[in-house]
Amino acid sequence: GNTYSANNKQQTDIEQLMPKYNSTFAKMNGNYSYKLIWDDSMVSDALQEAKEQYSTNATFKIRRRKVFIKGDNATMEEKVEGALKYPVLRADKFLRRLLWFTHYACNGYYDTKGGHDVLTVACLYREIDYKNSHY
């Protein structure tokens, strides 16, 4: 018999965090909002970074993987905040040194496939040299 039939819903076990948790990422970077500009064009790069494909070009990066037990009833917002809180705090002196108008984006994914749930998040910060950019 085919054991996969009825239970094999066409639903993925991996949830991408953007765009749904954009405001959560912005909140976690809130101390630096005076100098940072969210850049939608970097969102897919941030996902690649979370997936450990390190080709992304960025001035500074934060990446964190956090494991949750199945049935953890924290909201996804709480999980994302919990995952980013300490990496952002630890990065404070680097984030403060970033140039004004640094572009940034975060992304990640929540994977429920294995015995535990795994949240992986990444934020990329890219300094933009406006002196040499032509519009």
From Swiss-Prot:
<feature type="signal peptide">
    <location>
        <begin position="1"/>
        <end position="5"/>
    </location>
</feature>
<keyword id="KW-0732">Signal</keyword>
<protein>
    <recommendedName>
        <fullName>30 kDa antigenic glycoprotein</fullName>
    </recommendedName>
</protein>
<keyword id="KW-0325">Glycoprotein</keyword>
<feature type="glycosylation site" description="N-linked (GlcNAc...) asparagine">
    <location>
        <position position="22"/>
    </location>
</feature>
<comment type="similarity">
    <text>To H.contortus 15 kDa excretory/secretory protein.</text>
</comment>
<keyword id="KW-0964">Secreted</keyword>
<feature type="glycosylation site" description="N-linked (GlcNAc...) asparagine">
    <location>
        <position position="57"/>
    </location>
</feature>
<feature type="glycosylation site" description="N-linked (GlcNAc...) asparagine">
    <location>
        <position position="31"/>
    </location>
</feature>
<dbReference type="GO" id="GO:0005576">
    <property type="term" value="C:extracellular region"/>
</dbReference>
<feature type="glycosylation site" description="N-linked (GlcNAc...) asparagine">
    <location>
        <position position="73"/>
    </location>
</feature>
